Amino acid sequence: NEEALFQQMLIYERKGLYYPPHIHANRSETHIVLKGSLELFILDNHGAVLETHINCDNDSNITTVSSPIPHLTRPISDFVIYLEIKNGPHKPFASDCFIPRPFGMETFNERQYNDYLDEFSIL
């Protein structure tokens, strides 16, 4: 139910695909990895990396991103399955996304931004 005040989504993401940076207004988000490994990047308002966190199926890490912190997730393993929990009602993902321009740079395309994120990867 998209109007429910408690939202749980089982998410499947594949390595190598682009998952854009986004900001949730008035919503926090929690990630619990069930299979695979997931990177979480905490960003500034322009998309520059401030922090990196790793969640794996073999650890007990759970990450929560408070509102309105810019962030993105990226699979480390070939694929990742994770439970995402957030307060509702549900809002379409695309409406929360933004185009990254770290340090005032020109707009990155998806590949360039993923290359930029690689510089901060913990693994």
Question: Where do the model's predicted regions map?
Answer:
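A short glycine-rich, His/Asp/Glu-containing loop-to-beta-strand
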Residues: 1-21, 27
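His/acidic/aromatic-lined binding-pocket segments of jelly-roll/cupin-type domains
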Residues: 10-11, 22, 28-33, 63, ...
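Tight coil/turn sites that cap or link beta-strands
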Residues: 13-17, 59, 66-68
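Short loop/turn positions at the edges of beta-strands in beta-sheet-rich folds
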Residues: 15, 25, 34, 67, ...
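Short beta-strand His + acidic residue motifs that chelate non-heme Fe in jelly-roll/DSBH
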Residues: 20-22, 40-42, 63-65, 71-76, ...
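Glycine- and acidic-residue-biased ligand/ion/polar-headgroup-sensing regions
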Residues: 26-46
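Cyclic nucleotide-binding regulatory domains
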Residues: 39-63
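Double-stranded beta-helix
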Residues: 46-53, 72-123
